[in-house]
């Protein structure tokens, strides 16, 4: 006789769906969201924290998708590379890194240039300005005189025109220590694509490898001139400021600590079988990355990966249960690589399906994105009745929120709400239980206090809703499930194990969001009741 279909636990991550009581420029509050509104009213819910020390970041630092999914999947607060690298600069240990010292020696020995490439930003999501300044100090300390800074401007995790202030800070540090020059500026739209849009990456690559003098303008003046044309930091056209092309004999330090948007440019420079566009492999070329972007990359790594064991996916696999992951291109690495603690390979019994994101310049042009296809894929997997855990991500609130387009963000939120309704129907038919949450805020704050577009993440909490299924009841609770109101992302994995009745490993230090059976709301405390 065939096994009975499995009623799954489904974790739905609404990427960038934060909570903010104020409705001004709040795309989530303004949008028509009957599904989420009804769930918030009818089912156990709470708010959880997604930023700062609650996710292993410095106090007050906004969370992001990488950090969020890493914490969710690990079931513990994971110390982040931002803190790890900043500490190494502040205590001076980075200046004694054998990897960096060897690179400096190789460059000097060949009479080459040292190129510093990365996101020039104080956003702290992919990189940090203090890390670049620390590398300039490293070059001076080790007597590397020919140093080229290739500034990738942000405008996505920061204010759209904050780049000029960052550039001026870099130039001030260069002037102070007498080492380095800003050779190029380029928006992250080109240099940090992660969706295999090789035409964009090629423009950045060509800028870095084709030399020239520039036209005499400073880097800050170039940015100001672009601003006057309504071209903001993210979209700064690849522009040469001063001589300093990457040539044989040179060395590169790519100082982004987050891998997903650094990989493609690194592939172009280092992989012999690269086929994204035609180019000649530059050799010899010493190439160092701050963190491991991809184990296949033939580069040296300064900060080796931290080992995370007994994470959620691993626990599920060890129990012989099957799991499924799906998202569209923009968030696929997050439900796979990051959710699995930085492991590329799936666990045994872990199936994945990637949905292609729309090929548009910016997602406000297609705010529905691929949410319908993600829903179709998740429903098809759920109906198979073979998965105990399904993890999925709706990218719309975050990706459209990053555009700063309020109207499009509202459309994105409404699209996700419609898809959520259809998804719940599929899960309900299987008797499964649903956990609905987010990895960080974004779309709830689309303008700053002065009315300017806000394209970055926020430090706001996010909703967490538990929709209990008929065939996947919370053990021992009956109809009286109560959620804690002091949770964080690291508590989600223990909650899932709680529902699946699986033991929680000792090094998974998060705590289930479900209060113990028999919890008396009246005599202990009253959970926070907030309406969206």
Curated annotation (Swiss-Prot):
Enzyme Commission number(s) from the entry: 5.4.2.12
Catalytic center residues: 65 (phosphoserine intermediate)
Gene Ontology molecular-function annotations: manganese ion binding; phosphoglycerate mutase activity
Reactions catalysed: (2R)-2-phosphoglycerate = (2R)-3-phosphoglycerate
Annotated CDD domains: iPGM
Cofactor or coenzyme needed: Mn(2+)
Binding locations of Mn(2+) 2: 15, 65, 439-440
Cited InterPro entries: Alkaline_phosphatase_core_sf (IPR017850), BPG-indep_PGM_N (IPR011258), Metalloenzyme (IPR006124), PGAM_B_sf (IPR036646), Pgm_bpd_ind (IPR005995)
GO cellular component, one term: cytosol
Residues binding Mn(2+) 1, per UniProt: 398, 402, 457
Amino-acid positions noted as binding substrate in the UniProt annotation, renumbered to this chain: 126, 156-157, 188, 194, 258-261, 331
Function: Catalyzes the interconversion of 2-phosphoglycerate and 3-phosphoglycerate.
Family: Belongs to the BPG-independent phosphoglycerate mutase family.
Full protein name: 2,3-bisphosphoglycerate-independent phosphoglycerate mutase
Organism: Gloeothece citriformis (strain PCC 7424)
